[in-house]
Amino acid sequence: MQTLPIVDTSNTASSQHIFDTTIKRRKTRPVKVGNVTIGGGYPVVVQSMINEDTLDIDGSVAGIRRLHEIGCEIVRVTVPSMAHAKALAEIKQKLIKTYQDVPIVADVHHNGLKIALEVSKHIEKVRINPGLYVFEKPNVNRTEYTQSEFDEIGDKIRETLEPLVVSLRDQGKSMRIGVNHGSLAERMLFTYGDTPEGMVESAIEFIRICESLDFRNLVISMKASRVPVMLAAYRLIAKRMDELGMDYPLHLGVTEAGDGEYGRIKSTAGIATLLADGIGDTIRVSLTEAPEKEIPVCYSILQALGLRKTMVEYVACPSCGRTLFNLEEVLHKVREATKHLTGLDIAVMGCIVNGPGEMADADYGYVGKTPGYISLYRGREEIKKVPEDKGVEELINLIKADERWVEP
């Protein structure tokens, strides 16, 4: 997915008169995942996950390809068993042979050392869940964890994690330490409670093990299904890492966001809030829908925040009694005619009151001035007045005259 450069006005001659609205992103180290880089000032990366069974090799290849073709830059695949790990090797080979190489993340959970070691040979990144990687079955009769019991499990975690860390380190591959609020280890729950603090300490424990083995190709996530918990956890991990001199990139997401309009709003509320604060280097919108439905939401969030510009930005007033044409209908026509373009700002304004002033930053404007006619603008300059029924056609002609039109 092409991303146009975002104009930085901070160093212009008149910058002292401009309030800089550019989001200042938290500084993080670059982590390579195949041919994609997360963090390090690179554009925020868009991810998703296929929902095919990994044992279905052809179906998985097709699912990965569908996502990649519409702009998904890294694709995650579940690997619950050794059979799935071996199937993933075939998926990777077939993908390269029939399409192209796509960065893949293997999702490994319960007691997954052997599985993770196998998949690390074939793909670019392994995701592990600290609460499940060394799975301790909860003891319903337990009332506390002594420090020695806590440390004993910590030693077991290190023993189990070390071979994977060494393998990834020596191959130049990466790992996501993916904490989920709903699957914290029992010892963390007893020590910190079901809290963002417990999530953060769970991640920090794994980070320290990796660092002790000189492995820093890490991405961290703090996912929760409730937005306030997710926000608190990400803000806390960013604060803790800054205090500890850690600069690992963060993968943002609201897990189990649901579907439809509310699922999109819920994901946006969590992801966009953090991105606006400069927190986050890669995102996934998790919807209970086909994975392909997640990608446009990701790019819309990034475009709305000015972090990536990959489509036309439409500016349109909400309509009122002053509107001189059917604004909803015209906006739809303009969008359908121009949505394939990249990087333009087009304003559709219903009257002269909102028109020139509020669309001043747009590349092109379509404004109702008198009944039956619309005025076309290039930036702040009025170019021509045309009959309403010729408005969209003449807008296209204006874009063509500026050599900014491409055929769909």
Swiss-Prot record:
Pathway: Isoprenoid biosynthesis; isopentenyl diphosphate biosynthesis via DXP pathway; isopentenyl diphosphate from 1-deoxy-D-xylulose 5-phosphate: step 5/6
Entry note: cofactor: Binds 1 [4Fe-4S] cluster.
Top EC class, one word: oxidoreductase
UniProt KW 4Fe-4S keyword: yes
This protein's record includes keyword Iron: yes
GO molecular function, one term: iron ion binding
Alphabetically ordered keywords of this record: 4Fe-4S, Iron, Iron-sulfur, Isoprene biosynthesis, Metal-binding, Oxidoreductase
Positions that bind [4Fe-4S] cluster: C317, C320, C351, E358
Annotated HAMAP family: IspG
Known function: Converts 2C-methyl-D-erythritol 2,4-cyclodiphosphate (ME-2,4cPP) into 1-hydroxy-2-methyl-2-(E)-butenyl 4-diphosphate.
Full protein name: 4-hydroxy-3-methylbut-2-en-1-yl diphosphate synthase (ferredoxin)
Organism: Nostoc punctiforme (strain ATCC 29133 / PCC 73102)
